[in-house]
Amino acid sequence: TLMFEEEVVERRLAFKPDPELGNLCMGIINDVRIDIREVPLLDDKGVESTWEYAGCKFPVLVIEFKQCKTDANPKDRYYTFTAKPVTTLNKKGEPVEEKTVINIIQQVYGQLRHIANQFKGLKGYPVNAGKCPGLDYAAPAKVRCEQYLAFFEYFKHLLVGDDEKNPIYKNVKLFMKLVADYNTHKFLAFPSFVNRGFVERVIPGQSPSIEFEAGETIHLAKDDTPKN
């Protein structure tokens, strides 16, 4: 007899800006991993997919943060930052302007370098990691996926170090600036551009230097404050 238990899926709460920190958040990195997603050649209807990464092993760098609890905010709260290979074709299959592709890649690099820089000087930080692997945005999709995998592994190594069981990031507190998503204003996320910073290692006795830029807000659409 086959017995089936219903899987209980809990909705994870999002980070909540802390008024005591000027609406910044304080959190730690909870997990860093690379997910490899096999992209099917056929879509849901059995039609050959026109997406440029169809048939590829598509790497996704996942950095999961957990908010530090306070008396006013005692619940488990998470924020997940992901970095993916940049698409070079639009939905019509037309090439995206080269300048735009380069800007998006540099934006992702800037975000990852900024996060990794917060761990410089800590025990285990790989000072001999060398240069970040390059990306040829004009290469075939499968080659690009391999290059992105090396690119993401480089940054994972900067955050984790050589000892996966005792990662550099473990229990390192960070000030974090999460803002309403620029396009939808429906969720909080890191800003696309580093500017004066969106993450900063907490140093006892020092106030954060991160500030909100003009146009950045924590207020979400249909509501004045993040839910829960």
Could you tell me what each predicted segment is?
Residues 1-228:
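Short beta-rich binding modules
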